Regions:
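Amphipathic coiled-coil signaling helices used for dimeric signal transmission
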Residues: 11-15, 22, 26-53
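Signal-transduction coiled-coil helices of two-component systems
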Residues: 13-16, 20, 43, 79, ...
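Conserved long alpha-helical elements within nucleotide-processing catalytic cores of c-di-GMP signaling
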Residues: 55, 68-91, 98-125, 133-137, ...
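Catalytic-core segments of nucleotide cyclases and related cyclic-nucleotide turnover enzymes
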Residues: 109, 149, 153-160, 170-173, ...
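Flexible, glycine-biased helix-capping/connector loops in cytosolic signal-transduction modules
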Residues: 12, 17-22, 86-88, 98
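The cytosolic transmitter module of two-component sensor histidine kinases
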Residues: 2, 29-36, 112, 152, ...
Length: 225
């Protein structure tokens, strides 16, 4: 009668040793075998939670809490394969915080980090249904699968409006947050790779950055001061 529970426990232990942590040991025995089975199950549960925690840390940006560059690279590799096989379409949004180096030089990196966190929260709020990746000091990427241009345009308009509202109501510091953004689309049957779509979005972002900076330095219109 002890043979069957021991056999099940042995099989479960072998699965765990092979890397399968999705095991549930169902042993109703109240003897030493049952105690051992419960202990092994607890060990598996703890190990599963620990691995989940390690994975989360490995793919999370420490400063902002968004997905990091490692998560971004892994997702992009999978997306390139899926785009070819499944004929999906997607949009790539590239964002860059304006004047971050100047801000760090003038106010210090602690202030710069606070501004990055605030910018990250604005991006997450504007694209709350999508994963935000921080891939550089001041650079963020959002990938929108099954993207429709009209919906993406609305997301960007709302995002821009959100920055205006934040800067108007922000009492923590006088420095205004400015985030340049660009977008590009990948369509099914397109021969482009993710890298080429990213380059297009990155170029659009730099054009937006130039426009924002020119608006900053432009003289006031007649009747304005």
């Amino acid at each position: 009668e002890m043979t069957r529970p021991l056999k099940e426990l042995t099989e479960a232990a072998q699965k765990v040793a092979g890397g399968n942590l999705e095991v549930n040991i169902d042993c109703e025995s109240k003897d030493e075998v049952g105690v051992l089975a419960d202990s092994v199950q607890q060990m598996v549960n703890h190990l599963r939670h620990y691995i989940d925690y390690v994975n989360e840390q490995a793919y999370t940006d420490a400063l902002t809490g968004v997905a990091n560059k490692a998560a971004y690279k892994e997702y992009v590799d999978k997306l390139d394969k899926r785009a070819a096989d499944e004929k999906i379409k997607y949009a790539v949004v590239v964002m860059d915080i304006n004047n971050l180096k100047k801000i760090n030089d003038n106010f210090g990196h602690e202030f710069g980090d606070m501004l990055i966190r605030d910018a990250s929260r604005l991006i997450q709020k504007g694209f709350k249904d999508h994963i935000v990746y921080r891939i550089g000091g001041d650079e963020f990427v959002i990938i929108i699968e099954q993207a429709e241009k009209a919906i993406c345009d609305e997301l960007l308009r709302n995002f821009d409006d959100g920055i205006v509202v934040f800067n108007k109501n922000n009492t923590k510091y006088e420095q205004k947050i400015q985030i340049a953004r660009g977008i590009a689309f990948y369509e099914p049957d397109c021969i482009d790779s993710f890298a080429s779509v990213f380059r297009e979005a990155d170029h659009a972002m730099y054009e937006n950055k130039v426009m924002q900076k020119s608006m900053q330095t432009a003289p006031p219109a007649a009747g304005q001061s």
